[in-house]
C-alpha cells in the first residue's frame, strides 16, 4: 500500500479509538481523516491506496448524516470497513456500507464489527 487513510465519524470517540487500534496493525504512517471535520474537502484515492472507514451503527444503520461520505472518491481503491456498535446488533450495516462504498469507487477488502461504548447506553 502506498498510503493508508483512516476516515471516521465518531461522536463519542469510541469509533475513533477502534480505528486507531486497527490502524496500529499496519506498518508506516496512517493519516486520520474526520468525515465531519473542518477539513472536509474531497479526498480521491487510487488503486495503490488503502482506506479504512470507521462508522458507528445505530439500529442497524450507518448514521443518517447528510453528505457524510460525499468527500470520499475511489478508483478501484481497497477499503476496509469498520462498524462499531453498542447495545444492539449491527444487522446488515456492513453490507449496506460495502454497497455504498462500491458506488464511490472502492472495493471491500475486509470488514469487521466492533463493540464499543454506545452513545445511548
Model feature map: region roles:
Residues 2-5, 10-121:
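FMN-binding flavodoxin-like domain, especially the glycine-rich phosphate-binding loop
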Amino acid at each position: 500500500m502506498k498510503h493508508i487513510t483512516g476516515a471516521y465519524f465518531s461522536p463519542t470517540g469510541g469509533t475513533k479509538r477502534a480505528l486507531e487500534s486497527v490502524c496500529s496493525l499496519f506498518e508506516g504512517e496512517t493519516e486520520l481523516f474526520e468525515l465531519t471535520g473542518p477539513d472536509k474537502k474531497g479526498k480521491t484515492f487510487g488503486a495503490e491506496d488503502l482506506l479504512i472507514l470507521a462508522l458507528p451503527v445505530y439500529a442497524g444503520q450507518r448514521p443518517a448524516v447528510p453528505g457524510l461520505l460525499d468527500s470520499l472518491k475511489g478508483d478501484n481503491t481497497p477499503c476496509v470497513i469498520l462498524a462499531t456498535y453498542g447495545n444492539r446488533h449491527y444487522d446488515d450495516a456492513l453490507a449496506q456500507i460495502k454497497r455504498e462504498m462500491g458506488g464511490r469507487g472502492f472495493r471491500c477488502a475486509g470488514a469487521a464489527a466492533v463493540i464499543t461504548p454506545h452513545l445511548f447506553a
